[in-house]
């Protein structure tokens, strides 16, 4: 099973993923924890290029192509092999993030992103948890973590557009995407997620 976790900055994805990973291991499942951009040595180098704020200005086209280069490497070297071995893959962000951030945030044409997905993404998640919180709540949490990366330094209206596209994706693909109110306690969020995962694993 392939599970992705989505949301704007500071919504608690990392906490949920770590908790869910431990719960699934305790239930006897073999779990692979990974992230985007990143997940392989090469893809992590691309991640560094994408997130470092102190570099030359990056065009939106360059940003998008770097993301999909990292994703292609990640899929072929980590996600697809793990799924072929019957493992559960927990991935911090996947293709929905490209729609939300590059189409919503950067306002790139959706068809450009859809085309790359069709060409280079051989597998979509079986289940996606969208952790949703007001932008100001998430950004305050992100600031409390310390130095902000290149995306976290964007303006509030950027993240407002990102959130709107996540909501649109959830409406369009309600069978796959589950919205979770990220202002709830971490314990409650983890229980909701675990309940949905275990129910899906039974079928």
Map each language-model feature to its residues:
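Hydrophobic anchor at the beta1->P-loop junction of P-loop NTPases
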Residues: 5
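Conserved lysine of the Walker
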Residues: 13
